[in-house]
């Protein structure tokens, strides 16, 4: 068998030499005189995979011991995580604890905790870092500990217009609908606003195809806290919202809010994350596709 050589083009930031780059790689494994660091991980409640990713990253990429507080939404997974990570728990580099916001606040402010990582909403992050809106506006954090976070947001789906075939249009509409339906819309990366070109001759047909594709999925349980409130807030602000599918007890129908006015920059759909099975659509005006 002939030996194969792999080649890659590596780009470095301006001012960073090859020597600098090599020196900074795997730094935690080169420095033998590091001070111990305790990382508090406030686990995600919506996607269990994120919990494992976070603690593994802290342990093996950042060389920090981990105190994981399970989210009350999926704390039933705690015993399974303890079983999977038992060797690390036995060595004393990982420990799981349980509780809600009160316990989380206590741990964030505990003097033994050096750094914090969380997965959640911007509201939770602000509560941890600033406490009140006044502190946030004045940029007065409650804690000087490093706090990293994976937060949600108003994620756009930017549709590039073109002379799509019927099959292409239907396939892309299915992709957008599935993206929302995944985990009932309770993902930080779920689509929240579909952005289209107003003069695209397939605009109306595409939006209709997304609606049809979403209707192929049954309504899902609104298992995440405050989902019903998010749903109600958006529907109260947009009477033209289209409810898709029948919802049983404890379920929420899928919702598409069409024709958002892009000039209304403070619209709830542009400013707030709809953490449920809901998204909106807005059409931008431009003379041509490059302008769009």
Protein language model features and the residues they cover:
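Conserved small-residue-rich beta-alpha loop and adjacent elements
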Residues: 1-88, 92, 155, 277
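Conserved NAD(P)+-binding/catalytic subdomain of aldehyde/semialdehyde dehydrogenases
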Residues: 38, 87-193, 198
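Flexible loop/turn segments at secondary-structure boundaries
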Residues: 47-50, 74-78, 103-105, 124-126, ...
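Short, solvent-exposed amphipathic alpha-helical segments in soluble enzyme
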Residues: 55-58, 133-134, 211-212
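Structural alpha-helical scaffold elements that stabilize or flank donor/cofactor-binding regions
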Residues: 58, 106-109, 272
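ATP-dependent adenylate-forming carboxylate-activation enzymes
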Residues: 68-84, 97, 102, 163, ...
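NAD(P)-dependent aldehyde/semialdehyde dehydrogenase
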Residues: 182, 188, 198-292
